[in-house]
């Protein structure tokens, strides 16, 4: 379904004006736990995200884990950096946005990952 959505947006010339984000707040244990029944649990040390459109350069991977997928080894991304990247793609000011009542609010303390943009 995600591939079809991205294809449709691209074919209609809408992908550059649309940011698609698919993410989760945690991964799964990179090993099968010895429990009954055996299985995997939440693993907060690594998670995956897909960002497409909205100025994001396509066909790239960002970040790397160790061989077992347990821990980030390069370009670790924290949730606040992911949020800042989304706000940047949508041209939403991070440090001084105003809500509908005119109040200024700090949306995130993270910095956008500019290497993701083409």
Identify the role of each PLM range.
Residues 1-118:
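Ligand-binding pockets and gating/stacking loops
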């Amino acid at each position: 379904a995600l591939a079809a959505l991205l294809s449709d947006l691209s074919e209609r010339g809408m992908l550059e004006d649309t940011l698609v984000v698919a993410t989760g707040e945690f991964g799964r244990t990179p090993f099968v736990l010895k429990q009954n029944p055996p299985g995997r649990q939440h693993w907060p040390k690594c998670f995956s995200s897909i960002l497409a459109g909205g100025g994001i350069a396509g066909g790239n991977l960002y970040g790397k884990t160790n061989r077992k997928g347990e821990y980030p080894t390069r370009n670790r991304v924290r949730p606040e950096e992911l949020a800042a990247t989304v706000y940047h793609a949508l041209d939403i000011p991070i440090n001084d946005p105003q809500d509908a009542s005119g109040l200024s609010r700090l949306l995130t303390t993270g910095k956008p990952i500019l290497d993701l943009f083409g």
